[in-house]
């Protein structure tokens, strides 16, 4: 049993029975106000280009149109090959926000990539089934990874009519070592 409070002594002296409070940071950064959370993951600075190239099977070019650097709000980096675009985004958008966002269609509430559970979604308007998105909720924000197959044959590593989610799973293997730890679903 834990007791806390005050007791009165003979001379009306008061003593607390609780230990002094300490300013301990919560173990879940998602419980903190946005301005007190850790720095967002920066995919451009923290994912080696070599890992991206290994994941997509060849040389990549950065996609400047995808790049955003808004510390505390949105960090985005994108790369392109002749077959695919791969983008990684970090934000503090919550799982519930994604589940309630009409722009996304949930495919799996706890899809795992390399034993890390996350949220697998597609874009609601992706009628050609050429994109796939995997979302993790980490200690340094939501990490959103998207693969777009383009071209008439939707190729990935030379395979025609590739499944975008299987392609994303394969592309993520080498880059996931760079992702922050934590699973805060």
Walk through the language-model features, giving the residues of each.
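A small/polar (G/S/T-enriched), proline-flanked helix-loop surface module common
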Residues: 9-185
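C-terminal motif of bacterial Sec signal peptides marking the signal peptidase cleavage site
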Residues: 2-5
């Amino acid at each position: 049993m834990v007791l806390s409070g005050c007791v009165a002594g003979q001379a009306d002296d008061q003593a607390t029975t609780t230990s002094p409070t300490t300013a301990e940071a919560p173990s879940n950064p998602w419980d903190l106000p946005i301005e007190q959370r850790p720095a967002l993951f920066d995919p451009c600075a923290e994912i080696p280009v070599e890992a991206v190239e290994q994941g997509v099977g060849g040389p990549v070019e950065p996609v400047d149109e995808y790049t955003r650097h808004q510390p505390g709000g949105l960090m985005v980096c994108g790369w392109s090959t002749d077959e695919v675009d791969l983008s990684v985004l970090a934000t503090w958008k919550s799982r519930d926000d994604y589940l309630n966002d009409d722009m996304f269609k949930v495919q799996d509430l706890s899809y795992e990539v390399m034993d890390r559970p996350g949220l697998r979604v597609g874009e609601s308007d992706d009628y050609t089934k050429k994109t796939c998105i995997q979302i993790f909720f980490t200690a340094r924000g939501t990490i959103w990874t998207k693969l777009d197959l383009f071209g008439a044959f939707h190729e990935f590593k030379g395979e025609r009519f590739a499944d975008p989610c299987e392609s994303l799973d394969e592309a993520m293997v080498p880059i996931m070592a760079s992702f922050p730890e934590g699973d805060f679903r």
